[in-house]
């Protein structure tokens, strides 16, 4: 299932290719890593910061429905005890509890989407736009306006 919130934009017709990569979960990477230390500290497990994923922003993400359903049935007790956004839960706790839950690596997540620091992501992605983006109106709108204009859109 493609999660495409109203503040997303798709640049390329690549949905089938991304579905065929076999990931259970993929979303744009989080470029700011400071929240991870707070996440591990709030769980009272500071050692977790070494295991946390920087991949999986949920507003523009692709999720394997069957795996999410199965893991929801198992994880609902744990999920109900946390106050984290669902994307943080799925990209981190599920991956730690179920190592076979397949989450994209950083490079693939970058090709999939950008959110935070889009210009930095663009450079890290070899100056290529991703499949799509999330929260473009919050993060460097000047960068995004140029990209949209090149695609024939004027916002």
Predicted regions and their residues:
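Active-site acidic Asp-centered loop
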Residues: 4-5
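Conserved donor-nucleotide/metal-binding helix-loop-beta segment in metal-dependent transferases, i.e.
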Residues: 8-47
């Amino acid at each position: 299932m493609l999660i495409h919130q109203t503040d997303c934009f798709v640049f390329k017709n690549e949905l089938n290719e991304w579905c065929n990569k076999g990931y259970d979960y993929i979303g744009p990477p989080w470029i700011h890593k400071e929240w991870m230390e707070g996440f591990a500290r709030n769980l009272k497990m500071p050692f977790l910061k070494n295991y946390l994923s920087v991949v999986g922003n949920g507003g523009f993400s692709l999720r394997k429905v069957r795996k999410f359903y199965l893991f929801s049935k198992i994880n609902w007790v744990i999920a109900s005890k946390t106050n984290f956004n669902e994307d943080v839960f799925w990209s981190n706790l599920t991956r730690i509890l179920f190592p076979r839950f397949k989450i994209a690596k950083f490079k693939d997540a970058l090709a999939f989407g950008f959110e935070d620091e889009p210009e930095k992501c663009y450079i890290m992605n070899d100056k290529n736009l991703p499949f799509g983006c999330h929260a473009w109106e919050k993060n460097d709108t000047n960068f995004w306006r140029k990209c949209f204009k090149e695609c024939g859109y004027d916002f």
